[in-house]
Amino acid sequence: MGRIRKLDDLLANKIAAGEVVERPASVVKELVENAIDAHSTVINIELEEAGMAKIRVIDNGDGMEEDDCLLAFERHATSKIHDEHDLFRIRTLGFRGEALPSIASVSEVELTTGTGSGPGTKLVLQGGALVSRERAAGRKGTDITVSNLFFNTPARLKYMKTIHTELGHAADVVNRLALAHPDVSFRLRHQGKTLLATNGSGDVRHVLAAIYGAETARQMIPIEAESLDFTIRGYISPPDVTRASRNYISLVVNGRYVRSVPLMKAIEAGYHTLLPIGRYPIVFLSIEMDPVLVDVNVHPAKLEVRFSKEAELNELVTDAIRQAFRKRTLIPSVSADSKMAKPKAEQAAWTFTHRVREPSVLSSDIGGGEDATAPLAPLTGDAPAERPSAAVQTDECGILDEHGPAFERKQEEEVGEERCSPRLPTDGQAEDKAAADRLPPLYPIGQLHGTYILAENEHGLYMIDQHAAQERINYEYFREKLGEATKEVQELLVPLMFEYPADEYERIAACRDELARCGVFLEPFGPRAFLVRSHPTWFPKGREREIIEEMIEQVLAAKTVDIKQLREQAAILMSCKRAIKANQHLRQDELFALLEALRQTTDPFTCPHGRPIIVHFSTYEIEKLFKRVM
């Protein structure tokens, strides 16, 4: 008798549940996605003990007929695809027909559903076996409760985390589904306490406000981009609004929230040099494309996807983020922690008039160049002390209506106060700013501790980190100077020797041509060593060995060398080494030239490491600190 036998359905479902149902959050995801596929507009999720004790999902969707109820718990039974061609044009969130039987096999399930055109149906299942079947009220929609998860697989229970951790995973799933479907009203409750409530208005900003708070939602910057194959829309946080992990980046493809490492890298490339190391933005991107261009049938959980034109999509995402930042002045503003008050009637408006000192030619090299020492025209203007404190109408989430009169009044009130946390932009703000216009003219008035430059204009006071400012100036200079990899090489007086184990030596020897194309020529020297007698001229002095070792490591790991990345690292290194340091006092003309050189850079707001360069104290905020407005 043969040893191979067919598994019974219950055992097969338990095995499938190992991939589909990893934790309570997996059940929440599958049930809510079914509700969305059923065209629900209101979905309520109730959890007890983070879903381990009970998960209940109630929707007002299409519901099911009695016969469909029974088939729904059969393996590979689905209403969402019919033949193999449908696999390449999937528009629904579910399609595999595995979720419900897998969930039912490791829990107790009670399902009540109806189409609204007759009596409903109620099913009770335990461990995948049907316990009871009866008629129920004919309410349109579905009410499904999953209890005692993993009751018959105690080994799985051992791997569950704390209630707090499991609840966090479940809430994260609902948050991302709510972002992906802003036209659906979601309500998530745990032990009777509401954790999330969205209004289903279709405005993603309202969902962002419900998840991250109204203040964060107000600061989010809208982005959009389009190509022949892709349409991208979403919101990104300014560089000063960051988090400690990538968990706040939400990606949605054709209404399905997904995970994609290449897209994550494309987003981070868009923020390049704008974020400090270890900090990540808040991002929501919705990407629409022909279903033929994306494969969602990679894993039973349907979170990982593959794109047919991945490089094109990544480039579009990166460019969209960069374009959004090029349209804005990203100077953080410092505000006084006090309620906005109306100025006293006797407080007169003051006038800003600055007499420009024509700077002399610099004796020290601060990277300004001739343009930085050109005299500037005097800047005069009136900056009223009074800032109206009239209430501004907002919607229920605390977000200004960008098309209403209240938003226009608010914009008028803030003329002259360019902020890093912009209000929701109007369509007229889509014009690109020239590099120098992104940073207003600044007039130095001194230094603080020989480290920070104090400058002024009609908008208030500015503090500039002089080291970070020249880092940015130097970085853009060296990045352009290095250019493309050159064939010019610098001969070494003393050759560099690199030794490797025998296995790595053979792999490196096989990739010598790749390194030679980059200007690094490896000469075999003995059984396990190479000599390098020259290097490209763009290598920073004193860092030759380190860069060559990194190039060899890239060859070992990826069989290729990313010259662009190496040049980028070299530019950052040289910009930092050659920048003025803290506690270095500068003359007035040197301060002036440094600020003008900073204005000419393409990104004058952060250093190459992502740290802020400049902070703004508005005139109004300063007057509040001194109680000149009461």
Swiss-Prot record:
GO biological process, one term: mismatch repair
Region named Disordered: 361-386, 407-431
Pfam family, one: DNA_mis_repair
InterPro entries: DNA_mismatch_repair_CS (IPR014762), DNA_mismatch_repair_MutL (IPR020667), DNA_mismatch_S5_2-like (IPR013507), HATPase_C_sf (IPR036890), MutL/Mlh/PMS (IPR002099), MutL/Mlh/Pms-like (IPR038973), MutL_C (IPR014790), MutL_C_dimsub (IPR042120)
Listed Basic and acidic residues bias regions: 407-421
Keywords on record: DNA damage, DNA repair
GO CC aspect terms: mismatch repair complex
Function statement: This protein is involved in the repair of mismatches in DNA. It is required for dam-dependent methyl-directed DNA mismatch repair. May act as a 'molecular matchmaker', a protein that promotes the formation of a stable complex between two or more DNA-binding proteins in an ATP-dependent manner without itself being part of a final effector complex.
Descriptive protein name: DNA mismatch repair protein MutL
Source organism (scientific name): Geobacillus kaustophilus (strain HTA426)
